[in-house]
Amino acid sequence: KWLQQLHYFGISIVKNAPTDVNSGFDILKNISHTRETFFKTPFEVIDIPNPNNSAYTAAGLRNHIDLPYYEIAPGYQFLHCLINNATGGESVAVDGFKVIDYLKNNHPNDYDVLLKTSVKFVNRDYTTNTIRVMHKPIITLDHNNDYNDIRFSVAYMGVMDCHPDQMDHFYSAYRKLLSLLHDQRFEINFRMQAGDIFSFNNRRVLHGRKEYDANSGERHLQGYYMDRDEILGRLNYIENLNP
């Protein structure tokens, strides 16, 4: 049921998981292996000094996908809440496919621009002396012309290098999408509890966070990535056992 919810709806929250450090490994290994990145596995979502990512602060985060500057961004993300007794810090989720479907039906010209315009995503990582760059459209389709990916993160948008004649059209469409992705009609707001595993399709569901007061208590999540192939492979196997 967990994998079905992830595959068909893009989001699922597991309740009452153990809250021991790194215990997410014991749960996720029942699906498959996790995907390693320069953030390490698990990555610690906690307020730390000298962070190399805004997630490692107490600041609010705009709705985004993770690692848009990778050629293939992680397919799924799992955020395991170990403790959350700080004031604020509510989580936000948005079904990006629902938003771009709304955009397509109500603002077709903007949709077309975002489908066809390549965008520069950049990550400058001082901790590994690396600059990661990727050019991809914000919206991509699969071989059936169904939505395959939404690639969106304000924090990692690079300077646009498209033709000047395209610039105004692109930014007009981009602002429209940005507004919709933070429209309360499409947002789900919730507070993570210790033992929750917030699981979602990282290339469909955008996530964000409200600001929290790091002096009021602790908020510690551990994050894991997994490729789409692993989720689909395990789901195919299970469904074949129970046709």
Locate predicted features.
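Active-site environment of non-heme Fe oxygenases that use a 2-His-1-carboxylate facial triad
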Residues: 1-243
